């Protein structure tokens, strides 16, 4: 079973918080897969901030990095990939969860 969540409009901080909440909730409910719609970063306002990396200012790059760097989350993750075109392609990521 798949859980789908749209992160459009979230700041990086809020998106990371929500991603963690959703992953941990899905683990408890034995979800197998999560589709996060991140967008392609075309309309990202954070590029104006010189202190933020251009790539990591976009959710499609920062969300996977956040998950990999958070030990509470990464231990539950089987894989993180771009979605198939029919599921949003480059504007979405598929998280497959481990069976625990």
Labelled PLM ranges:
Residues 1-33, 40-100:
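Long, charged, low-complexity intrinsically disordered regions
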């Amino acid at each position: 079973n798949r859980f789908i969540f749209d992160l459009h409009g979230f700041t990086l901080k809020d998106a990371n918080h929500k991603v963690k909440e959703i992953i941990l909730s899905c683990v408890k409910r034995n979800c197998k897969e999560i589709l996060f719609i991140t967008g392609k970063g075309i309309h990202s306002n954070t590029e104006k901030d010189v202190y933020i990396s251009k790539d990591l200012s976009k959710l499609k790059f920062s969300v996977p990095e956040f998950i990999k760097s958070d030990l509470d989350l990464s231990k539950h993750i089987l894989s993180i990939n771009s979605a198939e075109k029919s599921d949003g392609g480059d504007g979405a990521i598929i998280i497959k969860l481990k069976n625990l």
